[in-house]
Amino acid sequence: EFLDLWIEGGKNTMAGSMRSVLSDMFREAIVEGRISQNPVTPTRAPKIVVTRERLKLKIYNCIREAADQLPAWFPLAMDLALVTGQRREDITNMRFSDIYDDRLHVRQIKTGMMIAIPLSLSLPVAGLRLGTVVERCRLVSRGDYLISAGIRKNSPDGSIHPDGLTKKFVAARKFTGIQFSENPPTFHEIRSLAGRLYKETCGEEFAQRLLGHTSEKTTKMYLDEREKTYLLL
């Protein structure tokens, strides 16, 4: 019944921790001869389902503002992630040489999906336009990568490891002083936020295509013969 109070409150992780603590306490009591059986043994460990806290635009804006305290490339990475809706590994792999015909060409590392995002793409509710974000990246980057901290010993080409985005996001999140749940939003949640915002402003079909979730029907929309493998947005 004691553990049920935590489980009913949706705090399965805490319930699991308390079960472990109680089991250790009763095990010590058995050793000392105070009791003969461990009452925790018959109980089942609560199933822990990690539910990531959804990132909302208001919270994103707070984290984005706090990100200005970090290296200049990171807030740009946040803007790029929100305006393009791409994954961490795709954000860190974007290059200036992949920009031509007024589009940013992206080959998603996870799925192999190839999309061409127009530089004119904008997300008014967030005050972002892809072309503007790209130009700001040019002012900061020292190489071909849009997001770069420059040539370093552990990065001779100037690229940023995807985990670097995750770590900097955690730092910015802490700078906000906001109290989050046990499973606070991560950098990856920016992609989900982008999907929801584009769904509201441009429709579900566009949002799905931007994220790379396409059907055979939508893949018929290509650029030209030379770039027919890229999905035109």
Regions found by a protein language model. Name each.
Residues 54, 108-112, 204, 211-233:
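Catalytic-site neighborhood detector that most strongly recognizes the C-terminal catalytic loop/helix
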Residues 68-70, 74, 84, 140-142, ...:
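Short, basic (Lys/Arg/His-rich) helix/loop patches that form interaction surfaces
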